[in-house]
Amino acid sequence: MTALALSRIHFPITTLGPGKRVGVWFQGCSIRCPGCVSMDTWAAGKGMTTVADVLDTLAPVVSSADGLTISGGEPFEQSEALAALLRGWHRLGGGDVLVYSGRALEDLARALSELDGLIDAVIADPFLRAVPQTVALRGSDNQRLVTLTTRGVELFSAYEAPLPVGERALDVLFDDNTGDAFLVGIPRPGDMVKLAAALKAAGHSAAATEDVR
Ligand code: SF4
């Protein structure tokens, strides 16, 4: 039974890859990019579950999902769980796979070769707060989108273009059990801070992870 530290799962998400996707956020990241908007995923050892349990959760929605996006946290810090999850996803008949990593692309070469055929596209390199953000799917323009399969080329090449102004979007998702709301997607610099301030002014409890770009 392969252990996995999990932050959350959402379906459907529409802002991190093509179509209606399953989003899986790994818990734990030691990279600690200044300005990261996912600081809640940094702590290791939280959200312990198993890959089998995650696949049981995903199974009912696989046929409705166009693809899977794995983010975090740093998925490659749980390489065994990542590989098991990807194999399970494909056993279930799941669609394309996009994986985010804060590691440099060069440092992922060995891991990606071991996962050959299981990932269609990867977005690599750390988030850099001082670098502009104009390209789709990336938090900062230094991050590289690499297609790894024929399907990846077909589905993700279009994302190399700059994101047109007015086409930025975030998914808003609610946790029915806790009442929490999550925003999914790539916010513009300062968006999270502005949103938290607006919600607080309206009398809601709101917290934003650090984003002082
Ligand atoms: S941006 Fe990604 S890699 Fe960087 S600290 Fe945040 S979760 Fe980790």
PLM regions with names:
Residues T2-S7, K20, S38-V99, R103-E114:
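Conserved Radical SAM active-site core
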Residues V165-R213:
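Charged phosphate-binding loop/patch that engages nucleotide di/tri-phosphates or the phosphate backbone
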Residues S101-G102, D125-F127:
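Short secondary-structure boundary segments
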Residues D120:
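Receiver (REC) domain switch/active-site residues of two-component response regulators
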Residues S101, T149, G185:
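Short beta-strand/turn micro-motifs composed of small residues
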Residues Q78-R87, P132-G179:
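P-loop/Walker A phosphate-binding loop and immediately adjacent motor/lid segment at beta-alpha junctions
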Residues M1-W25, S30, P34, S38-A44, ...:
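N-terminal [4Fe-4S]-dependent radical SAM core
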